[in-house]
Amino acid sequence: HIYIFNRKISTTFDSEKQYSVIQEAKDNMKKHLLCLITTILIAASLNAQPNYNYEKLQRENLGRGVVAIRKDASTVTVSWRYLSSDPMDTGFNVYRNGKKITPEPVNAGTFYDDSYASPDTATYEVRPVVKGKETNRKNGRYTLPANAPTGYIQIPMQKPANGVTPAGDTYTYSPNDASIGDVDGDGEYEIILKWDPSNSHDNAHDGYTGEVLIDCYRLNGEQLWRINLGKNVRAGAHYTQFMVYDLDNDGKAEIVMRTADGSIDGKGNVIGDTTADYRE
């Protein structure tokens, strides 16, 4: 007799039939083994996931981030930020010029379309609501300027003056890379903008490049500072990247970039040797 898995499968010997039964048993064993391996791999992958303590993760201390943009001639879209510290059941009341314009708290999103056709200035305020009561926890405001453009926010910028290289070639400036960060700790993002000269290029090309400038602006266009990387930092995508983040967790974002002798910080201080010139 032949037994497989303690089951009697034959009392007479037939070579072809017995071969078929044995092959079937092997196939079943392969299936069981494959299932076992798959189960082990899934369990291992789950155990490999880090166990985060989200209470200890560094977070930016951000405000409500209210912004109002004219959607069309008769509508203004108001948007704001839902914070990680907000209760899950938080709703929001929206006010225009001190008058509530939402019939009930907005709880299905963080934006609201206001029917407002006047070209005049309008101040919007967003107040969080929990269990039917305004908490006044991190209310946010934004003033829509008069005759605001449709579809975007207009931010005035201080374009640098044209420059001239030692070879006598004139260059101009244009906005290039940008990032965001709360540099002053007020809970709202500022814009960090790089001005790139028109003659920027990498070391595969000879010749001079203009000085790279980096500005910081509020959304209303107020310029907080300007950094000049100086003549010893070549202008080009390979050399003038920068990073913005609150690296030391003091509530204010830092900016990290390459500098050299002659670079000027946002307060007008010159770094290193003011007379050094490494371009030759």
Report residues per predicted region.
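Solvent-exposed loop/turn segments flanking beta-strands in beta-repeat/beta-sandwich domains
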Residues: L83-N97
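Proline/serine/threonine-rich low-complexity linkers at boundaries of modular beta-sandwich domains
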Residues: N51-E60
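Short, positively charged and aromatic/hydrophobic N-terminal segments
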Residues: I4, K8, T12, K17-V21, ...
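Boundary at the C-terminal end of the N-terminal hydrophobic targeting segment
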Residues: L46-P50
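Positively charged n-region of N-terminal signal peptides that target proteins for export
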Residues: K26-H32
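Bacterial N-terminal signal peptides
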Residues: C35-A44
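Beta-propeller-forming repeat regions
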Residues: R59-N61, A73-T75, Y82, P87, ...
